[in-house]
Amino acid sequence: MNIQTLMNELFRWCADGAPHDYSGTCDTLKTGNPETEVHKVAVSMFATPAVIRAAHEWGAELLIVHEPTFYAHMDDNFAELGNDPVYKAKRELLEKTGLAVWRYHDHPHCKFKDMISEGEVRYLELDGEWIRGPRWAVNRFHLNTPMTPRELLKRVEEKLGARHVRVSGSMDLPCTNLSL
């Protein structure tokens, strides 16, 4: 299977049968050739130099990321980056490795259930139900068992290894509805 075929399959999978105009999407191939055959695919939230190196060393031909590769939502800021040393080093690393990078952002957020939020809920082992809203709306999740922000904060720290999580408002008010 080549990169373009894989991209088309993932686009179709996220469609949920609902029409949507993706003509302005950031879900594009940032580096590489869409005709490249794919045998290994790496997936990460970010295309950091460490992730790029690890994907290349693992033998991946394609790295799928959720966030921008070159610091702007559409990754169309090359002229303004110009001779920026960080940009140049990352661009050179991608050229050296030959790794293709595809940003897969808008389609996953458009799916019910939003794929990113669904992953967060699953990883945090939250028990509840999704509340369907309009496309592109804030994702809402109803907890079956009330939880305080303090309890949720502790779970985020433990499950995700996050430190210095900030919360505003009452820390001990039991909640059942989350916006993600």
Regions found by a protein language model. Give the residues of each.
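Hydrophobic structural segments
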Residues: M1-L180
